[in-house]
Amino acid sequence: MNLDSKIRVIEDFPKKGISFKDITTLLKDKEAFRSMVDQLSDQLIDLDIDIVVGPEARGFLVGAPVAYKIGAGFVPIRKPGKLPGETISYEYELEYGTDSLEIHTDAIQPGQRVAILDDLLATGGTVVATAKLIEELGGEVVSINFLIELGFLNGGEVLKGYSVKSLLKY
């Protein structure tokens, strides 16, 4: 299925000059949603993945169904203060400041094979922070997979050394 035709583009959102890729139109289409999950799962099925990690918030929408389909567990990465148990955090740079992500300290066991799934690769800051948290807990980041990659933002450059795949590239 051509998933590109199911992505709505909204010009000048969230600010002028941005062409926002809205995945809600894909998610509400049962056949497109199933196709997205199937295609992402096909990229991972032979990699013996133990855990799929999805960063807040759209990584949950992409990662959880793929984890189910490939028979892996799912772990959410959250903004600070959203996880109830003991956590570790990783702070990363944004264009205008910093942000931080957290994971439960017992979410990943040493040696577990982990795939990171998210909806969109832009600059790569969120996924680098996610990978660092996984590695700090002893997990092995086997694959990083996206529905969409915005190639002109060069997020793939900061992910050199990782296996990165995207279904759609703009």
UniProtKB/Swiss-Prot annotation:
Disulfide bonds: none annotated. Transmembrane segments: none annotated. It catalyses: AMP + diphosphate = 5-phospho-alpha-D-ribose 1-diphosphate + adenine. GO terms for biological process: adenine salvage; AMP salvage; purine ribonucleoside salvage. Keywords: Cytoplasm, Glycosyltransferase, Purine salvage, Transferase. One of its GO terms (molecular function) is adenine binding. It comes from the Bacteria. Pathway: Purine metabolism; AMP biosynthesis via salvage pathway; AMP from adenine: step 1/1. It holds the Pfam family Pribosyltran. It is found in: Cytoplasm. The keyword DNA damage does not apply. GO terms for cellular component: cytoplasm. PANTHER family: ADENINE PHOSPHORIBOSYLTRANSFERASE. Belongs to the purine/pyrimidine phosphoribosyltransferase family. Homodimer. Catalyzes a salvage reaction resulting in the formation of AMP, that is energically less costly than de novo synthesis. This is Adenine phosphoribosyltransferase. The gene is apt.
